[in-house]
Amino acid sequence: MITTHPLHPNDLEEDKFHDECGVFGVFGHKDAAAHTALGLHALQHRGQESAGIVSYDGTHFNAHRSLGLVGDNFSSEKVMERLPGEVAIGHNRYATTGETTLRNVQPLFAEFDFGGLAIGHNGNITNAHALRKVLVKRGCIFQSTLDTEIIVHQIAISQFSDVLDRMIDALNQIQGAYSLVAMTEDALIGLRDPLGVRPLVLGRIDRANILCSETCALDIIGAEYIRDVEPGEIVVVSAKGIRSIKPFNKKNKRFCIFEYIYFARPDSQVEGRNVYDVRKCIGAELAKESHVDADIIVPVPDSGVPAAIGYAEQSNINFELGITRNHYVGRTFIEPTDQIRHLGVRLKHNANRGYIEGKRVILVDDSIVRGTTSEKIVAMVRAAGAKEIHMRISSPPTTHSCYYGIDTPEPEQLLASRMDIDLMAKHIGVDSLAFISMRGLYRAIGETDRNPENPQYCDACFSGEYPIELTDRNGGPLPAQLSLLTEQV
């Protein structure tokens, strides 16, 4: 009998940052849940560990949550039939806080005195443990280990009567980066934190309105992009139309710069810029800053492709797909023996000897995190006969961890925090290594330079300058989280 077993991400040696979540909401469409499932499918790159949808049919809230990919869990008619109604919200998750268990699948749902509320959150609350400690002392019982549940409890204890006032009151207690969608019995609500670190856009299809993380999720259902939700803005969609509220003190925008480099899908429009175009511009700037004579430019697929194209166009060196990626390696594998695990990166990538042998190769990738993947890719390309290997990275050295909703290693695990560039080059086995400068990155995005007094983006993973207070991080060891549900579901 053939059996399948869980294949841990470490088995694939994927050394990348991971965004935590994607969110999607629909108001006023007869196929709200189906559109939400399609939207989540388009946002699958933002979270692959779990997905959930909650709908409202005018009388009842209905929910379906599952571990795994959207297509594996929301493609059947039976599932869609259990999610009736013209309003729905959905959520994809990659865990940065809390375990990957069914009880941690969003959207979360709770009954209040004003009615039901479902909520899905992309980001990270940086004072979650401090707030949780206070809430537990007040008698709150947590059903998950999600920081999102902090928001739910803060809404529950608010003394205001109106649901929006209660949400605003709750969010005034919260520090962190967040974009979220919520659903009540008569409204779809979307909002961004005052710095606008995480993305959220507004769209329309027929007479229905959409809120979602990226424009690629609008494209898949044929919806029209209307605009970005502004930092600190709450958008309320109801039968009365669309209402905008800006209840928070205005702050300088600090959108996550890594959305342009890696997280967002290349076909999305982010903050008014096409992501694919920005990545090509980054590659061109990288070529200007760190030219080296070579025979071919080879991207590390898939995330290195746009920057490699830009590098090739700027340097007039041939672009070749010298590495092929296997897109069908999932989260399970037939009998994952130690031998298979030791294959590591070769499960996903293979060098094309016919194009690499005897060539001076420039490898282009989006980032180096721990360096484990880069080291193995370089060894693979070297084994395919490359004469020289020069690596070019379309982001500055990643020297600091992210605490705003991105799954990153601790600083001591980041290669660039432990080594200078020459040592990194020796460690991963390349003839030369170069990263785009901070100035070059900002120029590629459309700025003249980085403003050191007031940076235009959140670039804390490169600069170490955190625009939102890290209350939990700076408060010492984090306490264990209290929950009645301690067993994994």
Residue spans for each PLM region:
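Amphipathic alpha-helical
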Residues: I150-D162, P301, E313-R331
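Flexible loop/turn segments at secondary-structure boundaries
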Residues: D31-A33, T96-T97, N127, V197-R198, ...
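Short, glycine/charge-rich flexible loops or terminal/linker lids adjacent to PRPP-binding catalytic cores
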Residues: N316-V361, G371-T372, T399-G405
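Generic beta-strand/beta-sheet core signal
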Residues: G120, M183, L191-R192, G203, ...
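Conserved short alpha-helical segments that host acidic/polar catalytic motifs at enzyme active sites
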Residues: M1-P231, V236-A294, V300, E388, ...
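PRPP-dependent phosphoribosyltransferase catalytic core
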Residues: L171, D186-A187, R204, G222-D228, ...
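A conserved beta-strand->alpha-helix junction
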Residues: F74, S144, E149, F319-G330, ...
